Amino acid sequence: MFDTMPPVKGEGDYGYGTPKELGALLARRDAEEVLADRDRMITEITAELSQIVPGGNWLRDSEGTSTPCGEFGSTDGEIDFGPHYVSQIPVPASLWPRASQAVIDIAAKYGYTDVTSRTENATDETHKDLTIRDADGGRLAFGSLEASTMQVTTGCYLTAEDKRKAREAAPK
């Protein structure tokens, strides 16, 4: 039944999203650029953490996934829940300030500048965590207790191809 129903469109939507939602996503970088930067950032962070924490070897533990954007639901934009990375070696409390600061410094180069939570006065008996956000809703989560873990979720973005299609279909 639902497959035959026409899609619900908002005012001014010509098939690619309402002007407000689509306009916001067209102004953002292409999803491909964001994902490439995310991968570079993770590579830099895991390399630095491996230097700080002896024996730390970061491995991709799962594949990522993507989902439509709630905030930009009329568009083809997607949020990418990146792969989960794990090091079997936890960050000791004595190294947590240095490790978490390294993550903050590297993430800032990629636009993740809003530190929303950071464990202070870490102990080896409690979970240590760091969460950093970017201006477009991206989130970097880094934590440690019995092992260390990291995942980066992007904000909502359109692919270059989706942007091209939307621009070509726009009323002239």
What name fits each language-model region?
Residues 75-124:
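Long, charged/polar, surface-exposed segments that mediate recognition or autoinhibition
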Residues 58, 93-96, 156:
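Tryptophan-centered motif/residue detector
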Residues 60, 74-90, 134-151:
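Short, Lys/Arg-enriched charge-dense amphipathic segments
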